[in-house]
């Protein structure tokens, strides 16, 4: 049983799309988490000073010291916009994953074209999500004071990169020399 170039590209594209989907879940979870456990594992920004750890997402921030934690809601002006972009990033990453999987099992040029469009929109929403956060003056001031980006932010940026790779693979699969055909069986 052999695979043609189009199927191999489709399988790799599916892998990157799956990773982008998982990372979009982590980014969204870190942004909307409202407890120290959720923010510790997927915060968008964290800081440590004098035995006190601080974790923040879009909607909540938590401080932890000596086994005690205190969380409060952020009054950040951009939290609704960032939450909307994060949710749309998640939805478009999911739609992209489904379209790539469908394309792999039922090759169709129209599905490939729609998949490229959905992937591009997912990239735009992901870029807007981490761009709004990184461009905020309060975040910049915190970073200057010693805070660092957390795993939620990193997941969002990496999701963008993986969607970009999946988009490039999707466009390559549309080229005439990469036409996907059925898997051929042995004689």
Short names for language-model regions:
Residues 2-5, 66-82, 138-151:
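Membrane-interface extramembranous regions at the lipid-water interface
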Residues 24-83:
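A surface-exposed beta-alpha-beta supersecondary segment
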Residues 180-187:
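Non-transmembrane, juxtamembrane loop and terminal tail segments
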């Amino acid at each position: 049983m052999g695979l043609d170039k189009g199927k191999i590209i489709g399988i790799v594209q599916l892998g990157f799309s799956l990773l982008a989907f998982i990372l979009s879940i982590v980014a969204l979870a870190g942004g909307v988490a409202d407890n120290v456990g959720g923010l510790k594992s997927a915060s968008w920004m964290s800081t440590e000073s004098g035995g006190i750890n601080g974790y923040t997402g879009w909607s909540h921030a938590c401080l932890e010291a000596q086994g005690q934690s205190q969380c409060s809601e952020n009054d950040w002006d951009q939290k609704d916009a960032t939450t909307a972009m994060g949710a749309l990033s998640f939805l478009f990453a999911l739609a992209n994953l489904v379209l790539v999987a469908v394309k792999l099992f039922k090759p169709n040029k129209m599905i490939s074209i729609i998949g490229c469009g959905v992937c591009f929109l997912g990239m735009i929403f992901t870029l807007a999500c981490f761009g709004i956060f990184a461009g905020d003056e309060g975040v910049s001031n915190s970073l200057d004071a010693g805070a660092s980006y957390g795993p939620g932010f990193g997941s969002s940026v990496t999701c963008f990169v993986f969607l970009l790779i999946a988009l490039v693979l999707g466009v390559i699969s549309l080229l005439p020399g990469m036409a996907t055909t059925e898997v051929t069986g042995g004689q």
